[in-house]
């Protein structure tokens, strides 16, 4: 037991409120962590002893880290906004501390929080803004009690769409996917979440218009979310024919089939890379948008409502650089960056899915919808933040004793320094 106590990592709990106290209780018998005290911004709590732990001000942090060999800080502030959390992270990162966080306040108050709920800081915290809250009426409008089909249902966007959809109580959910394993995986996940909903898995190529029309007619589909696409810029650049076939022809087939079988709503998932495209992927998605708008113009008397949604980069999606950066940091670096000034817009996968659903409820005339994602993010700053949040220091000319190096490798063919969301007033 003495040896085990020596191997424990010393931690501080940031937040001496209900969440922090619940966490200290949960950590009492932890074989891995030993609580040294609380940190809190409330002056009235400083120097008080709660549950046997002293409450310290942030001004004492440097001394605490040095004298107690602190490894981690657990954020027990589940109700604070993202800006405040970012400010706290910046302060903690000065001391090379690994920051971990907790789930919602309701789970803590209800006593449902356990030591296993402690996790690494959420990747969503990389956004320099709070998450955009959805309109509940819009979420329900085209889904509740209706038959929904999602193409690319096994992908990162498609699967999150499905997770959001099943919460809105559709009549049926059809999962259309060409990748067998991806289809199996999302089907298994969704059937566990909702055992009562009729979920149908369809191993189908979205370019097959005849098969699509059969499906739309057989199941009387009300709403289609077209998420199937190839998204990796460099791969599509090297596989132009397949990229165009999958991204453009599938949109044509879906749009024609939707009109022919009187589907009520069709939503195309597009990208900010479709704006003044400089690569094949962006061009293929812009062409997909034009196909949707062209088919709408040709079939104005149709009962099918078309809408288009443009995304920025979705955090932790299959096409995002974030998982790659995380892997490089975990392996000790270097983290590769194409250009020191490259910027991107970012959104969470939840925001992305909710935007798609709301756009489908608002769209009628093949309008293009975009999410207000605030200011674009400088990728170099994002990498530095990720390195710091992981408990490491950036190694550069100013700090040769740092842990992780950032290596500039040059822009890839077709890659922009910055993205736009709209072309003029389109």
Task: Locate each region found by the language model.
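A solvent-exposed beta-alpha-beta segment
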Residues: 2-108, 181-187, 192, 199-200, ...
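N-terminal Rossmann NAD(P)H-binding glycine-rich loop of SDR-like oxidoreductase domains
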Residues: 148-166
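Active-site Tyr-X1-5-Lys
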Residues: 253-264, 277-306, 318-331
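Conserved Rossmann-fold cofactor-binding substructure of NAD(P)-dependent oxidoreductases
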Residues: 203-223
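Flexible, Lys/Arg-rich cytosolic regulatory linkers and terminal tails that connect or flank
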Residues: 46, 53, 58, 85-147, ...
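Conserved Rossmann-fold NAD(P)-dependent oxidoreductase catalytic core, especially the SDR/UDP-sugar
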Residues: 110-111, 226, 230-289
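Mid/C-terminal beta-alpha module of Rossmann-like enzyme folds, strongest
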Residues: 362-426
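A conserved pocket-lining segment of Rossmann-fold NAD(P)-dependent short-chain dehydrogenase/reductase
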Residues: 301, 324-347, 351, 355-379
């Amino acid at each position: 037991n003495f040896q085990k106590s020596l191997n424990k990592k010393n931690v501080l709990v940031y937040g001496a409120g209900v969440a922090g106290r619940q966490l200290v209780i949960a950590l009492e018998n932890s074989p891995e962590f030993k609580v040294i005290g609380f940190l809190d911004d409330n002056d009235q709590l400083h120097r008080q002893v709660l549950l046997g732990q002293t409450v310290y001000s942030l001004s004492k942090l440097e001394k605490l880290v040095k004298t107690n060999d602190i490894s981690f800080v657990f954020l027990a502030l589940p109700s604070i906004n993202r800006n405040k959390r970012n400010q706290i992270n910046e302060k903690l990162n000065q001391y090379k501390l690994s920051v971990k966080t907790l789930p919602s306040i309701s789970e803590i108050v209800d006593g449902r929080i356990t030591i296993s709920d402690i996790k690494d800081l959420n990747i969503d915290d990389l956004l320099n803004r709070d998450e955009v809250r959805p309109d509940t009426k819009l979420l329900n409008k085209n889904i509740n009690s209706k038959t929904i089909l999602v193409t690319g249902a096994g992908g990162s966007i498609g699967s999150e769409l499905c997770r959001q959809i099943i919460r809105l109580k559709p009549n049926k959910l059809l999962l259309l996917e060409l990748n067998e394993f991806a289809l199996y995986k999302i089907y298994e996940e969704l059937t566990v979440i909702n055992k009562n909903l009729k979920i149908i898995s369809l191993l189908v190529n979205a370019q097959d218009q005849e098969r699509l029309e059969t499906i739309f007619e057989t199941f009387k589909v009300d709403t289609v979310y077209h998420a199937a696409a190839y998204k990796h810029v460099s791969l599509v650049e090297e596989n132009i024919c397949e990229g165009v076939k999958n991204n453009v022809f599938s949109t044509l087939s879906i749009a024609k089939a939707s009109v022919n079988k009187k589907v009520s709503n069709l939503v195309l998932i597009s990208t900010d890379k479709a704006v003044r495209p400089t690569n094949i992927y962006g061009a293929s998605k812009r062409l997909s948008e034009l196909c949707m708008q062209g088919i709408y113009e040709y079939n104005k008397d149709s009962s099918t409502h078309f809408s288009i949604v443009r995304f920025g980069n979705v955090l932790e999606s299959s096409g995002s650089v974030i998982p790659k950066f995380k892997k490089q940091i975990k392996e000790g670096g270097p983290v590769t960056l194409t250009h020191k000034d490259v910027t991107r817009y970012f959104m969470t996968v939840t925001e992305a899915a909710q935007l798609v659903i709301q756009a489908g409820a608002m769209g009628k005339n093949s309008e293009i919808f975009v999410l207000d994602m605030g200011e674009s993010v400088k990728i170099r700053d994002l990498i530095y933040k990720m390195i710091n949040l992981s408990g490491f220091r950036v190694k550069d000319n100013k700090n040769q004793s740092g842990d992780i190096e950032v290596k500039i490798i040059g822009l890839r063919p077709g890659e922009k320094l910055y993205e736009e969301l709209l072309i003029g007033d389109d």
